């Protein structure tokens, strides 16, 4: 299991939101490229970038920052989400050196777009499913749909999706532990690898994820915990490596 540091981009800065609310953000750095360097030097093997402005506007806003990070670390797998709603945007990021693009809102509203993207960019597409009480949320979490997460995840199995990033909105940015039972259930219900996201606070939460013994969980995204110092990236990754030998 990989520990994946999150860099959330808002107005060119690195921030964290509480429960997806743009008005409730904390700025952690005005230099996201330097922040990426910090996590790389700390031993991370993958980075999770989110264009928050892009998620709300439906098109890339902080793309220049994403490109700068991808070009600085050409051998580091980078995944980007937020505002990815066209094949042109995916092509732009892939050409810039980004390893994976995360399709969120568009995947819920137009599931056929995921299949189209997977055909055009095989191995490059991740689906981001954000949920509240098991139901998918869209548009920067502003809307909660009547679609169940597990049902939608199964629909993407035949498309060739590389992974699903599952975020429990109620947990995100609250550092109260992630929704392990549902994350494990999702991993068991689909053949697509799952990346857990939202609510990780400390090493105990990583241990709890490992204790779930769900082989389909391949990563855990962490944000506020590593910025506020309650979780150390290198220590958490070492724990995962030891447990999964």
Swiss-Prot record:
<dbReference type="InterPro" id="IPR013785">
    <property type="entry name" value="Aldolase_TIM"/>
</dbReference>
<keyword id="KW-0368">Histidine biosynthesis</keyword>
<dbReference type="InterPro" id="IPR044524">
    <property type="entry name" value="Isoase_HisA-like"/>
</dbReference>
<keyword id="KW-0963">Cytoplasm</keyword>
<dbReference type="Pfam" id="PF00977">
    <property type="entry name" value="His_biosynth"/>
</dbReference>
<comment type="similarity">
    <text>Belongs to the HisA/HisF family.</text>
</comment>
<dbReference type="InterPro" id="IPR006062">
    <property type="entry name" value="His_biosynth"/>
</dbReference>
<dbReference type="GO" id="GO:0000105">
    <property type="term" value="P:L-histidine biosynthetic process"/>
</dbReference>
<protein>
    <recommendedName>
        <fullName>1-(5-phosphoribosyl)-5-[(5-phosphoribosylamino)methylideneamino] imidazole-4-carboxamide isomerase</fullName>
        <ecNumber>5.3.1.16</ecNumber>
    </recommendedName>
</protein>
<dbReference type="InterPro" id="IPR011060">
    <property type="entry name" value="RibuloseP-bd_barrel"/>
</dbReference>
<dbReference type="InterPro" id="IPR023016">
    <property type="entry name" value="Isoase_HisA-like_bact"/>
</dbReference>
<keyword id="KW-0413">Isomerase</keyword>
<dbReference type="GO" id="GO:0005737">
    <property type="term" value="C:cytoplasm"/>
</dbReference>
<dbReference type="GO" id="GO:0003949">
    <property type="term" value="F:1-(5-phosphoribosyl)-5-[(5-phosphoribosylamino)methylideneamino]imidazole-4-carboxamide isomerase activity"/>
</dbReference>
<dbReference type="GO" id="GO:0000162">
    <property type="term" value="P:L-tryptophan biosynthetic process"/>
</dbReference>
<feature type="active site" description="Proton donor">
    <location>
        <position position="130"/>
    </location>
</feature>
<feature type="active site" description="Proton acceptor">
    <location>
        <position position="8"/>
    </location>
</feature>
<comment type="pathway">
    <text>Amino-acid biosynthesis; L-histidine biosynthesis; L-histidine from 5-phospho-alpha-D-ribose 1-diphosphate: step 4/9.</text>
</comment>
<keyword id="KW-0028">Amino-acid biosynthesis</keyword>
<dbReference type="InterPro" id="IPR006063">
    <property type="entry name" value="HisA_bact_arch"/>
</dbReference>
